[in-house]
């Protein structure tokens, strides 16, 4: 399996939206504020794909995962909506998608990946650390006084 670009030729927008919502569903009772994934609609998702670079993991015609990324000057590629269908998690699909983002960053002359993950999702912190990311900052969403997310970076 190799990541495929999510571009104008991509045609399975309903499945992509379902994938993201299913992948992010487990965190809803655990995080506050709610994930921005819940605000996605088909038009918003299509616009996000046009404005950013995105990849899909597809096997035997089934959409298994996705990743979105966009340059953040001066040197980072910001990673968002890394999602893998629940029954395929832990099988290397997320890592494969991150490798596509790493290749895109390198080809774009960017030297690091940056992401944000919720403070409560410590299992995600561990996975990203295993993949070479280090915590570089903490922050809070607008309207919150407590920490709600951590920033992690990976130098390429």
What residue spans do the PLM features occupy?
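Short, contiguous hydrophobic alpha-helices characteristic of membrane insertion segments
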Residues: 66-69, 128-132
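Acetyl-CoA-dependent GNAT
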Residues: 4-81, 85-87, 98-100, 104, ...
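Generic detector of contiguous secondary-structure segments
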Residues: 3-13, 93, 110-119
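Conserved glycine-rich acetyl-CoA-binding loop
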Residues: 62, 85-99, 106-108, 119-126, ...
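C-terminal "cap" of GNAT-fold acetyltransferases
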Residues: 42, 46, 111-125, 129-131, ...
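Generic structural motif
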Residues: 1-3, 135
């Amino acid at each position: 399996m190799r990541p495929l670009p999510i571009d104008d030729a991509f045609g399975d927008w309903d499945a992509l939206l379902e994938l993201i919502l299913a992948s992010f569903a487990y965190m809803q009772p655990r995080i506050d504020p709610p994930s921005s994934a819940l605000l996605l609609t088909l038009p918003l998702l299509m616009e996000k794909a046009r404005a950013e670079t995105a990849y899909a993991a597809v096997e035997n015609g089934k959409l298994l995962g996705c990743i979105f990324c966009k340059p953040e000057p001066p040197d980072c590629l910001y990673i968002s909506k890394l999602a893998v269908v629940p029954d395929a998690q832990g099988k290397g699909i997320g890592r494969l998608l991150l490798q596509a983002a790493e290749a895109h960053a390198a080809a774009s002359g960017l030297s690091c990946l940056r992401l944000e993950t919720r403070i409560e999702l410590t299992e995600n912190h561990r996975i990203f650390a295993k993949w070479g990311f280090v915590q570089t900052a903490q922050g809070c969403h607008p309207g919150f006084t407590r920490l709600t997310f951590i920033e992690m970076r990976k130098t390429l």
